[in-house]
């Protein structure tokens, strides 16, 4: 990755979750303030880390989305949550969302939301 935040970078795109922009900004600021040496998008070995004399090492590898074993999952009309949130693939008008966890709800909210996010417009927020 070329920026910190991981899944927050997806979540901040969901209407009503724009506060994650601030979460990422806060952590960037704190890392800078504390002089934390952050290195992104690097492959390292144990020897690389040992030889640099760090006091502590945090390895944040991120996640790999789970792909369910469902017949047809590889069909061109099937869109994963990352592509849906990032707007990489068009989403039709009739959609089945598989999964009732937080990500399923976020994708549903994103693809059914019309107009400006209430979190960004006080007048819209007051009407919701």
Where does each model-flagged region fall?
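Rossmann-like dinucleotide/flavin-binding elements
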Residues: 1-4, 39-50, 61-74, 82-128
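N-terminal Rossmann-like dinucleotide/flavin-binding domain of flavoprotein oxidoreductases
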Residues: 6-54
């Amino acid at each position: 990755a070329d920026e910190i935040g991981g899944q927050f970078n997806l979540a901040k795109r969901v209407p009503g979750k724009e506060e994650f922009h601030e979460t990422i900004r806060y952590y960037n600021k704190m890392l800078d303030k504390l002089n934390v040496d952050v290195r992104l998008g690097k492959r390292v070995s144990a020897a690389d880390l040992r030889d640099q004399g760090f006091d502590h090492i945090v390895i944040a590898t991120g996640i790999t989305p789970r792909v369910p074993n469902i017949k047809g999952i590889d069909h061109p009309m099937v869109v994963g949550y990352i592509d849906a949130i990032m707007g990489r693939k068009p989403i039709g008008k009739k959609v089945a969302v598989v999964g009732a966890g937080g990500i399923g709800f976020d994708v549903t909210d994103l693809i059914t939301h019309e107009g400006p996010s209430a979190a960004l417009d006080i007048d819209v927020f007051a009407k919701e």
